[in-house]
A protein has these predicted regions:
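Membrane-embedded beta-strand positions of outer-membrane beta-barrel proteins
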Residues: 52, 138-140, 177
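Outer-membrane beta-barrel transmembrane strand signature
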Residues: 1-51, 95-112, 117-119, 123-127
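C-terminal beta-signal and terminal closure region of outer-membrane beta-barrel proteins
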Residues: 81, 91, 100-102, 147-181
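Strand-connecting loop/turn motifs
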Residues: 45-48, 133-135, 170-172
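Surface-exposed loop/turn segments flanking beta-strands in extracellular/periplasmic regions
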Residues: 14-19, 71-86, 156-166
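Outer-membrane beta-barrel pore domains and translocons
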Residues: 44, 55-57, 141-145, 180
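C-terminal region/CTD detector
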Residues: 37, 51-53, 60-62, 130, ...
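Extracytoplasmic gating/loop element in the C-terminal half of outer-membrane beta-barrel translocons
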Residues: 2-5, 57-142
C-alpha cells in the first residue's frame, strides 16, 4: 500500500504485462552466504589463559516461516489459545488469511547475516613450578555464547534457508579439571 505495508494476497506486476501471474515470480535473495568467515584468539598471562573463537556469514537470507505461520489474524484467531503465539507484526501486516499465497510473498525473507561467539574459555593453572611435569588446571568454557544478527527468527544459521520451528541451539557451559603428575 502507500505506507509500504504488505497487502494480503496482492502482488506486483513485475514484468509490466498487465497480469499478475507465474511470469511475475522472481527469486528474492538466496539462503547461501556470499562470505563465510571466522577468527580466534588466545592469550596467556602468568597462570591464566583465555581463548575465543568466532564465526559468521554475510549475505545470506532466511525465510522466517515461524513469523509466517503466526503472522496472520486467521492463524491466531481460530483458537483463543493461539493468540499468545502471535508474532509482533500480526497487526502491522494486516494479513487476514492463512492461505498458501503468503509463501509466495517476500515479506518474510530477512537478512540472516550473523556473527556467533562459538567458544570461549578461561583457565587457571595452579602452582606450576618450572621444570615440573605435574600441574592442576581449572577451566571454564562456554559454547554458543551469543549471536549478533538482524534476523528476527530463531536461528540465522539454517542451511535450507527456511526457519521452521527448530529447537534453538543451547548455551553450554563446561567446567574442567586437569590433573597431571
Amino acid at each position: 500500500d502507500a505506507a509500504g505495508k504488505p497487502m494480503d494476497g496482492v502482488f506486483i506486476d513485475r514484468n509490466g504485462d498487465g497480469l499478475v501471474n507465474e511470469k511475475d515470480k522472481y527469486r528474492f535473495h538466496k539462503p547461501a552466504a556470499d562470505v563465510f568467515y571466522g577468527f580466534n584468539t588466545s592469550l596467556t598471562y602468568k597462570n591464566w589463559d583465555f581463548a575465543a573463537a568466532f564465526r559468521g556469514s554475510w549475505g545470506n537470507y532466511m525465510y522466517n516461516n515461524v513469523d509466517s505461520n503466526n503472522g496472520s489474524l486467521a492463524g491466531v484467531l481460530i483458537n483463543p489459545t493461539y493468540l499468545s503465539n502471535a508474532v509482533e507484526n500480526v497487526l502491522e501486516t494486516g494479513f487476514t488469511t492463512n492461505d498458501i499465497k503468503r509463501f509466495e510473498s517476500d515479506y518474510y525473507i530477512q537478512d540472516a547475516s550473523f556473527l556467533r561467539l562459538d567458544n570461549v574459555s578461561i583457565g587457571y593453572t595452579f602452582n606450576q613450578k618450572p621444570d615440573s611435569k605435574s600441574l592442576v588446571k581449572l577451566t571454564l568454557a562456554a559454547q554458543n555464547v551469543f549471536v549478533v544478527t538482524k534476523y528476527a527468527g530463531l536461528d540465522p544459521e539454517i542451511a535450507s534457508g527456511i526457519d521452521n520451528n527448530l529447537y534453538p541451539r543451547p548455551i553450554t557451559f563446561t567446567l574442567g579439571l586437569n590433573v597431571n603428575f
